[in-house]
Amino acid sequence: MLRRVAELPWPLRYLLIAIIAIIVLCILCWVDKADESRVELHVRASHPLGIRLAPSLARWYRVDVPASQVDDALAAMRRDPFVDEAFVAPVVSLPSVDDGDACPITTPAYDHLQGYLAPAPDGIDAAAAWRRGDRGGGVWFADVEGGWNARHEDLPGDRISLVHGSPVDAPGWREHGTAVLGEVVGIANGRGVTGIAPDVERVVTASIGSSTSAAAIAEAARQLRAGDVLLVELQGLGPLGRFMPVEYWDDNFDAIAAATARGVVVIEAAGNGGENLDRALYRGKLDRKKRDSGAIVVGAGAPPRTGFSDRARLDFSNYGTRVDVQGWGRRVATLDYGDLQRCDDDTRERHYTDEFSGTSSASPIVAGAAILLESLAQRTLSPVQVRAVLAAAGSPQTGNTREHIGPRPDLAEALSAIERSAMRSR
């Protein structure tokens, strides 16, 4: 029979192949149900005598079959002498890089990525405080910036309250604020990240949305008590068009100074302008000998084992005598953004990152250290005392120390210094 088919003119042969394909399709589909899912098969016709044919799309057929009959359809077609190849059509997609890992059913622990918690000199040695049985209990914490996602699975939403302004309706602000809170108060539950001070009693947020930064700082401070900690996660463009710490502007300076005068410990980002804050251009506004807001100003230092010199100033960080201490300015694991874990929904409640950076990532580390110091001290420490202890008891800056950003806090040494001071005062 095959020989007879081969003797047919070529147009008739291809017509016969097409008819056979149609018959096979009809046989496969006669029991089809309207609501059954479909699968597309790709079938290539062959020469019945095995003669090699030139590649041509004219030899390809598309067969749509019910999903339940895929295996039988493939087997039947592959046995057919007129079929050279048959396979399930692949599902094609854009050749883009996935923005994050697949979302697991349960978020795993990411604390092994939080090197900033590690013993000094790599981190601030948060465990030195935790071993004393305290993780920030009794202290209130405020964060001043633009927005947050208090519904994130790793935040204590029942302890977070907005006291001023309207959150800025922009993903960048929400991601930033959520990442900041994760570093400080991320829940210690064996999943996701663990905040430096997860047992903080109350978390206050104050937004610059529909407000000024000075008003937001003032209202956040008004909600706090002596010994509580306020973090200012803001920067502004200075006279050279570079980012500056917000106390450069007099209204912000006054709001911060009023807060520290009441005993509130204020942590302030140095800013990402790569600028020398001791320049004469700034007219001594960032010279503590001329005026001192009482805030702890935080620069961005390089983390260990990342291709940079550990504890050296990162090039974007502002520097100068006004900068007191440093925190990790790169590779910080915390909440949101989604480059570490991304879940496909609009809530972003299970997003995590290990790439948070800038003086934005450095400042919450110091804020967490300050909370633990206040929580464990036998008496309320003044803002100036907290600043002095953190600056004196730390792992020293490396690299070009003339571009001063100060040491990385060492809580083990800082707590020992406080205990020694308490014993001397008895």
Language-model segments: residues:
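C-terminal subdomain of the subtilisin-like protease fold in secreted/lumenal serine endopeptidases
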Residues: 223-233, 295-297, 375-426
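Hydrolase catalytic cores
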Residues: 205-207, 329-406
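Active-site-proximal loop motif in hydrolases
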Residues: 117-121, 131-151, 160-192, 205-215, ...
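Surface-exposed aromatic
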Residues: 47-67, 201
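Autoinhibitory N-terminal propeptides
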Residues: 1-53, 78, 82-99, 125
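Substrate-binding/access-modulating region of protease and related hydrolase catalytic domains
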Residues: 5, 131, 135-137, 205-293, ...
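Catalytic-core environment of secreted peptidases
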Residues: 144, 153-155, 160, 306-360
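Protease zymogen maturation seam
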Residues: 50, 54-58, 78-140, 153-154
